[in-house]
C-alpha cells in the first residue's frame, strides 16, 4: 500500500498518472530524493529538500515555490492514517520536466510525492556485507539526483549477487549507483569529495560524527587498487 500526493490531492499511488507528453517519459528529465520517515518524523527533511532543489536547478527545471510546498505536503502525509507502516516508511518527492522543453530548460514542471513502505532492512547484509560491481565509467551529472538510472543499472545488469555498481572512472573510486562509498585506509576514513559525487545527506552526517569522535577523514577518491589493502569499506544512503 502506498499513497501519492499529485495534482493537489492524496490518492492511492496506483490511481496516479503522468501524461505521456511529460519530459520525464519523453526524455528522462526528472529529479527526485528519498527521505526516511521514522515514527512520522522525516529524517533530515530540510537537507533532502534543499538537495532536491539544487538537483532541479542543475537539470534546468524551474522550481519556483515547489520545494517549499513539499515541506507541508510531506508533513501532512506523515500524519495521515493511510501513511504506510504507521509512518515508518520511505518518502520520494519528484519533480519532472513537464511538457515544455525550452532549449534545454523546463519552465512548467510537474511534481508529486510518493509515500511507500520501501525495501526491508536485510540483517544478513549487515553481517556478511554486500557485493559491488566496479565499472570504469563515470556517473553522469553527479551533482544531480536524476530519475534516469538506466546507465548505472546497465553496469550490473543480470548480476543477481551484486547490490549495485561501483563507479571507478580512471581507477578512482567515487560512489555507487545509490550510495556514498567509504574506505578505511591507513587509519583514515577516505571518501570522494563533493563535486565528484552527489552530496549524500547520510554521508555528511557520518563524516561529521567521525570527526567529532576523533577519526581522521580524508576527502579524496580512493584508488581501486588501494581497496585490496583497506581494513574495511562501507556504504551509506
Question: Which stretches of residues belong to each language-model region?
Answer:
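Ordered, amphipathic secondary-structure segments that act as subunit-interaction surfaces
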Residues: 83-97
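Helix-start/capping segments and mature chain N-termini
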Residues: 1-64, 68-76, 96, 102-237
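Cytochrome P450 catalytic-domain "roof"
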Residues: 79
Amino acid at each position: 500500500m502506498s499513497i501519492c500526493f499529485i495534482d493537489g490531492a492524496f490518492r492511492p499511488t496506483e490511481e496516479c498518472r503522468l501524461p505521456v507528453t511529460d519530459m520525464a517519459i519523453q526524455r528522462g528529465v526528472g529529479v527526485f530524493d528519498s527521505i526516511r520517515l521514522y515514527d512520522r518524523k522525516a529524517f533530515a527533511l530540510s537537507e533532502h529538500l534543499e538537495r532536491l532543489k539544487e538537483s532541479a536547478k542543475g537539470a534546468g527545471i524551474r522550481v519556483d515555490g515547489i520545494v517549499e510546498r513539499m515541506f507541508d505536503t510531506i508533513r501532512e502525509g506523515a500524519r495521515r492514517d493511510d501513511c504506510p507502516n504507521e509512518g515508518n516508511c520511505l518518502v520520494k518527492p519528484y519533480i519532472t520536466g513537464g511538457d515544455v522543453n525550452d532549449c534545454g530548460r523546463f519552465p512548467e514542471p510537474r511534481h508529486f510525492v510518493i509515500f511507500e513502505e520501501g525495501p526491508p532492512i536485510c540483517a544478513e547484509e549487515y553481517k556478511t556485507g554486500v557485493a559491488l560491481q566496479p565499472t570504469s565509467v563515470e556517473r553522469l551529472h553527479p551533482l544531480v539526483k536524476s530519475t534516469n538510472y538506466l546507465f548505472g543499472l546497465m553496469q550490473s545488469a543480470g548480476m543477481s549477487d551484486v547490490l549495485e555498481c561501483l563507479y571507478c572512472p580512471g581507477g578512482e573510486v567515487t560512489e555507487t549507483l545509490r550510495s556514498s562509498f567509504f574506505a578505511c585506509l591507513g587509519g583514515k576514513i577516505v571518501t570522494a569529495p563533493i563535486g565528484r559525487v552527489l552530496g549524500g545527506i547520510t554521508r555528511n552526517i557520518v563524516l561529521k560524527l567521525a570527526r567529532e569522535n576523533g577519526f581522521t577523514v580524508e576527502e579524496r577518491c580512493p584508488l581501486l587498487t588501494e581497496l585490496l589493502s583497506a581494513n574495511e569499506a562501507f556504504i551509506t544512503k
